[in-house]
């Protein structure tokens, strides 16, 4: 079992966060996958924010960001496969937002910024690889 640190809800013991297993029933694996989902979603948002500043908006990207964030703040669905699917979709949405941003830059004569971190992290092909990647970006 991996180390866990989850502090997102009011159910945490003594208000300090859960470190072994969530009081709500969340497993350390789900917490890790949620951390990775948040990290990749930050990359989506980095591009979407810059595109929006140039007047380019993709409502599907915006809806996805909301869906991803909502997935991590509600303690009602700890389906690892669903979260894994959202991580993969986050990679697709990030690529879509990047293209939107780069196209907006071309149209406005701006040079696109070179982003790093969550804007460039590779989406792992397997669950095990996702868990390894999540360990690099979580709060535990």
Give the ranges of each region predicted by the language model.
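Metallocofactor- and cofactor-centric catalytic cores in central/energy metabolism, strongly enriched
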Residues: 1-140
